[in-house]
Design a protein with these regions (language model features):
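Beta-strand elements of repeat-based all-beta scaffolds
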Residues: 1-260
Length: 260
């Protein structure tokens, strides 16, 4: 309301279908409404005029079943619609061994500092979302029964796989980059301390008994350590450069837990 020097309103509109799902999201329009209610038709006309486009809205399409999952999204702008360029989703499950729908199974040790490959996930054990972008590029997201992503696969001349490894409490412990996952082979009890591929090409996170991250290691970097107070707030941190100098960074909080 009256957002500009000329006291014009910035008006945006969202349309819903009969099942209360978002069907169109219109780009904002400049209107001399002074906070008054505007009809659907007037907002649509103003949006087309303000954005100089016949289709200044994002359109969403859904499955015709009770799950109502998104199947296609068209971006704002007439060129997307004129050229039938949309973001498309296909919902699948993983296959056993072989093909784009296979996924390695990794087991993280109880201590959380090493892992081993344990074959492949059984057929149908993972939910898979296949995404096809406006240029035809394909990506697969594999999720376990807890909804955690265990693999993101980008399809090209060669597949590029990013694996996400969790401990038995559901904490993310390792992220294996595509180069790391392609070079590791059949990994057995390896981690950042005994494998250069993991140390240089992967992300590592370590947790205490309260599921607080106490160590974080980025690819090719020295680890960062974290220390918490009795309220689970991080008060000390130390990276590799600070460790070489015997230094720690300190964070102070007020009585409401805000950084002081």
């Amino acid at each position: 309301h009256d957002f500009s020097p000329h006291k014009s309103d910035n008006v945006a509109m969202v349309e819903y279908d009969l099942q209360n799902r978002v069907s169109k999201e219109w780009l904002p329009a400049v209107m001399n409404a002074h906070g008054a209610f505007q009809s659907t038709e007037s907002v649509q006309s103003a949006s087309r005029s303000s954005n100089h486009d016949v289709c200044p809205y994002v359109s969403k399409f859904y499955e015709s079943n009770p799950l109502s999952r998104e199947t296609a999204i068209y971006g704002a702008g007439g060129n997307w619609y004129a050229n039938s360029k949309s973001l498309n989703y296909v919902y699948l499950t993983n296959s056993g061994i072989g093909g784009d729908l296979t996924c390695k199974r990794y087991r993280v040790s109880d201590g959380g500092d090493s892992f081993s490959q344990d074959g492949f996930y059984a057929e149908g054990e993972l939910d898979v979302v296949k995404t096809i972008d406006e240029d035809g590029h394909i990506k697969y997201d594999f999720k376990n029964l807890y909804g955690d992503i265990v693999l993101q696969r980008t399809v090209g001349n060669e597949n590029h796989d990013t694996y996400y490894l969790y401990d038995y409490r559901g904490n993310l412990c390792f992220v294996l980059s595509p180069k790391a996952s392609s070079q590791l082979g059949n990994a057995t009890n390896i981690g950042v301390d005994n494998n250069s591929i993991v140390a240089n090409l992967s992300f590592f996170y370590k947790y205490d008994s309260k599921n607080r991250c106490i160590e974080k290691k980025l690819p090719g970097c020295e680890p960062v350590y974290y220390v918490y107070d009795m309220y689970h707030l991080p008060i000390f941190s130390q990276d590799g450069n600070q460790r070489a100098k015997g230094q720690w960074a300190f964070t102070a909080y007020d009585r409401l837990g805000r950084v002081a």
